[in-house]
Structures are given as C-alpha cells and as structure tokens.
C-alpha cells in the first residue's frame, strides 16, 4: 500500500471538517515547508515521527552493468530519513503482531 497526498487530504477532510480546498492547501504547504528546509540545508525534525536530514556523499568509483566499463559516480547530496523511537516501536510491534498471525 502507498499513502498519497490525496489520501492524506481526504483523511484530514473527514477528521477536521474543513473545506477540501483548505485541507489540500494545508497538506501542500506542509510538504513545501519540508522541501524548502531541506533545500536550505536544514534538518526537519518531526517529534514522535523522525528526522529528515542531508548527507553529502563523496565521489566514488562505479561500473556500468551492461558494458562493465568503470565510471565515476559524482559527489552528491542525498536526503536521509531516520525514524524516531516512537515510530520504530510501533513498526516493531506491528511486525510482532503479524508474525503471531502467520504462526496461527
């Protein structure tokens, strides 16, 4: 299953009883703020959920799998997500529940 912005908006629409346009704008503004912060090189910390931060990767050697030719992979900056403890705990407990159901 994939959770989309449209599904988030629909869920919030039913929970908050605001107009669909206001909810859509709210979701869009939230994600735009996350994007802007990361573009500026800032971390995004969402308490109880996790942190988004940037990691600089150095140039490294790579290989074209079709030709076998060695090519350099250029240095770049990537976005990394590190889940918070609460999120990790919930995911782990869900995994344990699913494992118990599979055993039965």
Curated annotation (Swiss-Prot):
One of its GO terms (molecular function) is structural constituent of chromatin. SMART domains: BHL. GO terms for biological process: DNA recombination; positive regulation of metabolic process; regulation of DNA-templated transcription; regulation of translation. This protein is one of the two subunits of integration host factor, a specific DNA-binding protein that functions in genetic recombination as well as in transcriptional and translational control. Heterodimer of an alpha and a beta chain. Belongs to the bacterial histone-like protein family. The keyword Disulfide bond does not apply. The keyword Transcription regulation applies. This is Integration host factor subunit alpha. It comes from Buchnera aphidicola subsp. Cinara cedri (strain Cc). One of its GO terms (cellular component) is cytosol. SUPFAM superfamilies: IHF-like DNA-binding proteins. PANTHER family: DNA-BINDING PROTEIN HU, INTEGRATION HOST FACTOR SUBUNIT ALPHA. Keywords: DNA recombination, DNA-binding, Transcription, Transcription regulation, Translation regulation. Pfam families: Bac_DNA_binding.
